[in-house]
């Protein structure tokens, strides 16, 4: 693949995302550009050569700079400080939880609706992969509510390899897919090689469910011993968030009890647990390092779930106020994942007030 053609799918994805954000159909964008819907479809799939003039016209039609024309070499930012911030802002939904929930949607053959999903690049890439294997994904409104419909049989042979290789999160497909296919392959996950420290903990956990993975030609060749389940507690060799999530995803469709030790109790893991509970999976120990999961042989239910707010975004906003010596109001802060940091900042001289606690839309996470 040449350097030029390698950029076409990326530009196409940017055009598609900007069009959807603008609320336009392919036909409406085509009419604005004076071209055909099929041409717009080819552009979004990265199958159409584009001139700079056409890219500029698309950008104007969508009120979005698709490609920035800058100089070569390193970029530099000039920051003019001493600007005081003011006002109030709501913390948006967790990006990491959103990614985990997209992978978890593969467990459910019913309709999954996720509320206020963060439309980050990782989410866009995962959606490209999901739709390529047969999942129907629909953005419902401007609030970024997302509907997912997973078919009874996935077309894993049609997986979008280019999109899969641009996301490390593809490794979290192993957990749900090992129950849905006896043999399948996944492209290497964004620079993660089999046997490295970042990948091996996943394999160690998933072997308990009969998964065997061999790396060949930039793909994970996976085979599964159907009906295999843990005969003893799974001890994670790394207390990682995605490792814990992968083990949870595998345990959810194991019709029996799975004990996961050395699990991450982090916010995105808890959000995944709350979502799995809505699917009918029973989980004990949420928020601790030992999880006991009672899975099911199949899941087919209509579920509506809102991931909680992002503590990283909340702390970024608080930090912005601190360094600019500002007084702002940050609403919908997931306080249980920030109390230690705020206590340390208070010892350093930070003064702040906080409201009474209330629950997030998931009915579980404590906010202030």
Regions found by a protein language model. Give the residues of each.
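N-terminal flexible/basic segments that precede or flank functional cores
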Residues: 1-9
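Positions in alpha-helical segments
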Residues: 9, 13, 17, 38-41
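Recognition helix of helix-turn-helix/homeodomain-like DNA-binding domains
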Residues: 31-49
């Amino acid at each position: 693949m040449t350097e030029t053609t390698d950029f076409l799918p990326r530009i196409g994805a940017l055009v598609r995302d900007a069009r959807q954000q603008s609320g336009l159909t392919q036909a409406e964008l085509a009419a604005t550009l004076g071209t055909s819907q099929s041409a717009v479809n080819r552009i979004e799939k990265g199958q159409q050569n584009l001139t700079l003039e056409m890219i500029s016209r698309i950008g104007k039609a969508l009120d979005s700079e698709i490609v920035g024309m800058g100089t070569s070499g390193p970029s530099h930012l000039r920051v003019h400080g001493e600007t005081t911030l003011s006002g109030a802002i709501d913390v948006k939904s967790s990006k990491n939880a959103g990614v985990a929930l997209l992978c978890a949607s593969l467990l459910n053959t019913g309709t999954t609706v996720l509320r206020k999903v963060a439309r980050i690049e990782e989410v866009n890439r995962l959606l490209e992969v999901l739709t390529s294997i047969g999942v129907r994904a629909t953005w419902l409104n401007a609030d970024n509510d997302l509907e997912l419909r997973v078919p009874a049989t996935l077309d894993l042979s049609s997986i979008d390899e280019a999109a899969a290789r641009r996301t490390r999160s593809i490794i979290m497909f192993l957990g749900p897919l090992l129950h849905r296919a006896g043999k399948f392959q996944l492209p290497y996950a964004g620079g993660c090689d089999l046997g490295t420290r970042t990948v091996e903990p996943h394999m160690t956990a998933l072997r308990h469910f009969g998964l065997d993975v061999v790396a060949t030609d930039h793909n994970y060749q996976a085979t599964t011993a159907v009906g295999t389940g843990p005969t003893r507690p799974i001890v994670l060799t790394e207390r990682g968030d995605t490792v814990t999530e992968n083990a949870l995803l595998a345990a959810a469709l194991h019709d029996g009890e799975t004990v996961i030790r050395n699990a991450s109790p982090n916010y995105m893991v808890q959000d995944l647990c709350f979502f799995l509970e809505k699917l009918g999976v029973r989980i004990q120990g949420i928020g601790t390092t030992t999880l006991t999961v009672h899975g099911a042989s199949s899941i087919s239910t209509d579920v509506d779930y809102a991931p909680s707010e992002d503590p990283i975004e909340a702390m970024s906003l608080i930090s912005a106020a601190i360094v600019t010596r500002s007084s702002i109001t940050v609403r919908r802060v997931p306080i249980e994942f920030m109390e230690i940091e705020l206590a340390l900042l208070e010892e350093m001289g930070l003064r702040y007030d906080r409201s009474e606690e209330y629950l997030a839309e998931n009915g579980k996470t404590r906010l202030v």
